[in-house]
């Protein structure tokens, strides 16, 4: 997967199209990511010891990795990601600028 935790991404499809945020969690098996402040859903929470009242809480739901693009730190634009071997290590490379991410 080409998206990692703490990457800055832009949503390119869905109800939050055009919004930007940082990746909080990655689920490689499901090809999904959780982005801070994006894809907020309301979850009905049962009463527990920690939250005795329960109620409706807003949480970030996972979004499919195909619906986000990595933001290139050099020019702050959404870019596709490629891979290159540098000094025997595989690194991510911006397709737009050619910079190592």
Swiss-Prot record:
Signal peptide (residue range): none
InterPro entries: KOW (IPR005824), Rib_uL2_dom2 (IPR014722), Ribosomal_uL24 (IPR003256), Ribosomal_uL24_CS (IPR005825), Ribosomal_uL24_KOW (IPR041988), Translation_prot_SH3-like_sf (IPR008991)
Subunit description: Part of the 50S ribosomal subunit.
Entry GO CC: ribonucleoprotein complex; ribosome
GO biological process: translation
Record's protein name: Large ribosomal subunit protein uL24
GO molecular function terms attached to this record: rRNA binding; structural constituent of ribosome
Similarity-based family: Belongs to the universal ribosomal protein uL24 family.
Alphabetical keyword list: Ribonucleoprotein, Ribosomal protein, RNA-binding, rRNA-binding
Function: One of two assembly initiator proteins, it binds directly to the 5'-end of the 23S rRNA, where it nucleates assembly of the 50S subunit.
Classification via PROSITE patterns: RIBOSOMAL_L24
């Amino acid at each position: 997967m080409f998206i990692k935790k703490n990457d800055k991404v832009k949503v390119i499809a869905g109800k939050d199209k055009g919004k930007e945020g940082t990746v909080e969690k990655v689920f490689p098996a499901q090809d999904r990511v959780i982005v801070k402040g994006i894809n907020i859903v309301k979850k009905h929470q049962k009463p527990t010891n920690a939250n005795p009242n329960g109620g409706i809480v807003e949480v970030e739901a996972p979004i499919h990795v195909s619906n986000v693009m990595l933001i290139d730190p050099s020019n702050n634009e959404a870019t596709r990601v490629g891979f290159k071997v540098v000094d025997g290590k595989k690194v991510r490379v911006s397709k737009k600028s050619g910079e190592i991410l």
